[in-house]
From Swiss-Prot:
It catalyses: a quinone + NADH + 5 H(+)(in) = a quinol + NAD(+) + 4 H(+)(out). It comes from the Bacteria. Residues 208-593 are annotated as: NADH dehydrogenase I subunit D. The keyword Cell membrane applies. One of its GO terms (molecular function) is NADH dehydrogenase (ubiquinone) activity. This is NADH-quinone oxidoreductase subunit C/D. It comes from Pseudomonas fluorescens (strain ATCC BAA-477 / NRRL B-23932 / Pf-5). NDH-1 is composed of 13 different subunits. Subunits NuoB, CD, E, F, and G constitute the peripheral sector of the complex. Pfam families: Complex1_30kDa, Complex1_49kDa. Its main location: membrane. It is a peripheral membrane protein. The keyword Glycosyltransferase does not apply.
């Protein structure tokens, strides 16, 4: 096993090194091949025969890696810069997170094209279920022992595995789409739910169960989302969430866009998050490039990200209250969002999807008069939140519908990969802005809102308090905005600062290449997670030394949150499910990508 700086590139924490020592002591250094990356965590390759044993060891350490944060694959066949790594046609990575250590570790396993099979780890982490299904769906990698290995993003009738490098990436490479009656009937039959396929019975000892399709076009499903309910009267015996209706192939598209031109696509993952989506992507690209942005860029990025946290939470608040029966507040929250969008549009030029962050900075400097717009909003919103709390959130009907409903504890949340307000509502004090500050969050004073019961009501109240904390952060940005440039003076800043392009022919050529072909990033891997509007969102980028990403893995919080639904809602009423869905705060683009 390689050691020292070859293990991973700083920044890293002491606990990261501790786990490498523990693994070496248990399995011997020869069991691992370390990979040097810019992910900020140990990245270790193991053999397939050792995989389950290593993962089980990490899960059961005294300070365990309790969360399977992510699991996915890479088609390695066209990757040229793989020196020092095990030979592989495909690889699968397991990204583990320990709350107690505040530490991550990534375990990788190499596979040959003729033997694409791994043992399932659903017995170690229950949330591996959907991740393994997606890896099979996208790459065709089998997981032996999986309880139901089937399509999850693509339709049941789909042929091929889209994230393989030999699968077409453009619509023009496919035959024109047509839908005749026979094909329509085939698709409808393929979508039919058969309880036996999922281990469900159609009847019990004294009753017949009813199976109800909620969605994919139901107002309380919050998007194109289908959940099949097994009902005994109004009681939910079991359920099966069915996702993928909003899948657009964002990770595949990243392989055909330059590092710069993919930025607008990030806006459309959590399409309510705006520039919050840009942030983990540009931070990860900047790690690859070795760019350190000016202090002013960090403060601007934080200010605008917190504005979008507020707009997202306001929409959540209005629709959540509407889901449990109050029709009026949603109109007020949307009006309040408009006040925020007035500020956002004045600064970025756009409202919902500004695509405003850039590699090495932001698109342009703050406009004249921005201070007054921000100041007016900061002074105005807290009083509105007080009104919502008093008029709606203290309402006895709303509290009766949500207190004690769809509750789970911290242990269950971590097992299912829950992050964000859903995790903090259980009392777990884990907010990346405090635990692992990025973009200068360590320079701001704010509290991390917590609750204790982990129910639908607590999840709502945590988000309301998060809006108050966002106002505190924005106010500090307003009062302490640094002077200086809005872009880094670095060769890979894209687009480059305009003043540098008009001096001589060399800078003009550099500018032309970067805005046409795109910047060339060094071959390596990088990773960045942030505390986004709906939980932890991250980008894991692989560069092969080109103008486009070799592999872009987008880990979203909502995917994990929807997988948890059956474990939480069994034994509850259908009405409780509606309150639960509203309290999760998800959009299907964030789930399906």
């Amino acid at each position: 096993m390689t050691t020292g700086s070859a293990l991973y590139i700083p920044p890293y924490k002491a606990d990261d090194q501790d786990v490498v020592v523990e693994l070496n002591n248990r399995f011997g250094p020869e069991a691992f091949t370390a990979q040097a990356t810019r992910t900020g965590m140990p990245v270790l390759w193991v053999t397939r025969s050792k995989l389950v044993e290593v993962l089980t060891f990490l899960r059961n350490l005294p300070k365990p890696y309790v969360m399977l944060y992510d699991l996915h694959g890479v088609d390695e066949r066209l990757r040229t810069k793989r020196q020092g790594l095990p030979g592989a046609d495909f690889s699968v990575f397991y990204h583990l997170l320990s709350i107690e250590r505040n530490s991550d570790v990534m375990i990788k396993v190499a596979l040959s094209e003729g033997d694409l099979s791994l043992p399932t780890v659903t017995g170690i982490w229950p949330n591996a279920n959907w991740y393994e299904r997606e890896v099979w769906d996208m790459f065709g990698i089998d997981f032996a022992g999986h309880p139901h290995l089937s399509r999850i993003m693509m339709p049941p009738t789909w042929e091929g595995h889209p994230l393989r490098k030999d699968f077409p990436a453009r619509a023009t490479e496919f035959d024109p789409f047509s839908l005749n009656l026979a094909k329509q009937q085939l698709e409808e039959e393929a979508a039919r739910f058969r309880p036996e396929d999922w281990g469900m019975k159609r009847s019990g000892a004294n009753e017949d169960y009813m199976f109800l399709n909620l969605g994919p076009n139901h107002p309380s499903a919050h998007g194109a989302f289908r959940i099949i309910l097994q009902l005994d009267g109004e009681e939910i015996v079991d359920c099966v969430p069915d996702i993928g209706y909003h899948h657009r192939g964002a990770e595949k598209m990243a392989e055909r866009q330059s590092w710069h031109s993919f930025i607008p696509y990030t806006d459309r993952i959590d399409y309510l998050g705006g520039v919050m989506n840009n942030l983990p992507y540009v931070l990860s690209v900047e790690k690859l490039a070795g760019i350190k942005v000016p202090e002013k860029v960090d403060v601007i990025r934080i200010m605008m990200a917190e504005f979008f946290r507020i707009t997202s939470h306001l929409l959540f608040l209005g629709t959540y209250i509407q889901d449990v029966g109050a029709m009026t507040p949603v109109f007020f929250t949307f009006t309040d969002r408009q006040r925020a969008y007035t500020v956002i549009e004045a600064i970025t030029g756009f409202r919902l999807h500004p695509a405003w962050y850039r590699i090495g900075g932001v698109a342009h400097d703050l406009p004249r008069g921005w201070e007054k717009l921000v100041k007016d909003f900061v002074e105005w919103l807290p009083k509105r939140l007080d009104e919502y709390t008093k008029a709606a959130l203290q309402n006895s009907i709303l509290k009766g519908r949500t207190i004690g409903v769809a509750a789970y504890n911290t242990k269950e949340a971590l097992e299912w990969g829950v992050t964000g307000a859903g995790l903090r509502s259980t009392g777990c004090d884990f907010d990346l802005r405090k635990a692992r500050p990025y973009s200068g969050y360590e320079n701001f004073e704010f509290e991390v809102p917590l609750a204790a019961n982990g129910d639908a009501y607590d999840r709502c109240m945590v988000r309301v308090e998060e809006m108050r904390q966002s106002i505190k952060i924005i106010d500090q940005c307003l009062r302490n905005m640094p002077e200086g440039p809005y872009k880094a003076d670095h060769p890979l800043t894209t687009p480059p600062p305009k003043e540098r392009t008009l001096q001589h022919i060399e800078t003009l050529i550099t500018h032309f290449l970067q805005v046409s072909w795109g910047p060339v990033m060094p071959a390596n891997e990088s990773f960045q997670m942030i505390e986004a509007t709906k939980g932890i969102n991250s980008y894991y980028l692989t560069s092969d030394g080109g103008t486009m990403s070799y592999r872009t893995r987008i880990r979203t919080p909502s995917f994990a949150h929807l997988q948890q639904i059956p474990s939480v809602i069994r034994g509850s009423m259908v009405a409780d499910l509606i309150a639960y869905l509203g309290s999760i705060d998800f959009v299907m683009a964030d789930v399906d990508r």
